[in-house]
């Protein structure tokens, strides 16, 4: 009897060890190194990038929003300039303080915090209209998107994580469950999200919580989530700054996020051994059929702020060098 019991115990231990080893292997993500193929700092003798706020790639065209220039630049995939979209000025059609951009069916939407509105432009760069929201209702600078004339934007309101605004008829609804941090200030500042569109679903990515969530846009219910707190790049900062996060503040761990095909790309943010800012690794996540960490993409620079992706090519804004780089696998 004791022998049988011993065999059962050994079998259970072996199974648990095997499961543990399998989980450990899953955590060992392959690192893929990228190199710089080309870059752009500006165009001509007077137009230089300095405060890039967003990057988008759509139908072989790259869109760059720059807050200092108060314009959106449209280029081809090799940085050849096609046109400038919008202009700085005091008028209702002019830019004041541009942030994130989004594209839907050849329409470009630019969120301007000066107007507290999403301004719409057609494929020729002509102004088509805008939809205004109060500043204290929304979070910027975070990614937003438009789907079937509905605007999806991260909200500071208690009713949900993000707003769905039907711009045709003006109706609104709140979606997503906010995390409760126990106090009003962290509840307000730590529930911001990057929002990305994927197959009639909304992907939410926090810049201070290591979690990705997917919401169905019809049911407004969360259908999947993924915790990535085990990634070495951010793990040490999460542990080191545990006390700081308790003091009505938060630790930034994500600089940007982008969807291309069936993959989500999360640009991680951390600190080096000497306390220097690092943002040069991307966590690549498979979206369907379930969320799954795939690999780590190592970028050649040290501090990138924004990214967009076209298949295996990455466009990244190098904050230190004030330029947009085209990066490819080594």
Feature map (PLM): residue ranges:
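Beta-strand-rich domains and repeat architectures in extracellular enzymes and scaffolds
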Residues: 42-70, 268-269
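Short loop/turn segments that connect beta-strands within beta-propeller blades
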Residues: 76-80, 122-126, 166-170, 216-219, ...
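Conserved beta-strand positions in repeat-built beta-propeller and related beta-rich domains
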Residues: 64-68, 110-114, 153-158, 204-207, ...
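C-terminal motif of bacterial Sec signal peptides marking the signal peptidase cleavage site
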Residues: 19-20
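Blade-level signature of beta-propeller repeat domains, shared across WD40, Kelch, NHL, RCC1
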Residues: 306-330
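Loop/turn-rich, solvent-exposed surfaces of beta-rich toroidal or solenoidal domains
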Residues: 247-285
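Beta-rich, blade/repeat-based domains predominating
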Residues: 47-58, 91-104, 136-147, 182-198, ...
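Surface-exposed loop and turn segments in beta-propeller and other repeat-based domains
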Residues: 35-47, 85-93, 133-135, 173-188, ...
């Amino acid at each position: 009897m004791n022998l049988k019991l011993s065999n059962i115990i050994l079998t259970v231990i072996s199974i648990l060890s095997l499961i543990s080893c399998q989980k450990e292997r899953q955590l060992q993500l392959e690192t893929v190194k990228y190199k710089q193929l080309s870059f752009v700092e500006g165009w001509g003798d007077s137009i230089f990038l300095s405060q890039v706020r967003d990057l988008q790639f759509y139908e072989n065209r790259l869109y760059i929003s720059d807050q200092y220039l108060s314009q959106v630049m449209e280029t081809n995939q090799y940085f050849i300039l096609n046109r400038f979209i919008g202009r700085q000025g005091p008028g209702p059609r002019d830019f004041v303080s541009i942030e994130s951009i989004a594209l839907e069916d050849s329409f470009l939407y630019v969120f301007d915090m000066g107007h507290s509105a999403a301004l719409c432009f057609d494929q020729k760069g002509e102004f088509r209209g805008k939809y205004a929201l109060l500043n204290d209702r929304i979070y910027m600078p975070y990614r937003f998107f438009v789907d079937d004339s509905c605007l999806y934007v991260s909200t500071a309101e208690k009713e949900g994580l993000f707003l769905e605004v039907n711009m045709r008829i003006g109706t609104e609804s709140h979606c997503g469950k906010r995390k409760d941090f126990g106090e009003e200030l962290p509840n307000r500042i730590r529930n911001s999200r990057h929002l990305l569109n994927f197959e009639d679903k909304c992907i939410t990515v926090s810049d201070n919580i290591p979690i990705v969530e997917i919401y169905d846009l019809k049911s407004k219910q969360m259908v999947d989530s993924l915790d990535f707190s085990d990634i070495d790049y951010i793990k040490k900062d999460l542990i080191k700054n545990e006390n700081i996060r308790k003091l009505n503040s938060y630790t930034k761990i994500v600089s940007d996020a982008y969807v291309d095909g069936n993959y989500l790309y999360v640009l991680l943010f951390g600190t080096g051994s000497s306390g220097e800012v690092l943002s040069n690794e991307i966590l690549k996540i498979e979206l369907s059929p379930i969320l799954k960490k795939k690999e780590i993409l190592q970028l050649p620079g040290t501090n990138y702020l924004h990214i967009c992706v076209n298949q295996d090519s990455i466009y990244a804004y190098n904050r230190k060098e004030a330029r947009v780089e085209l990066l490819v696998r080594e």
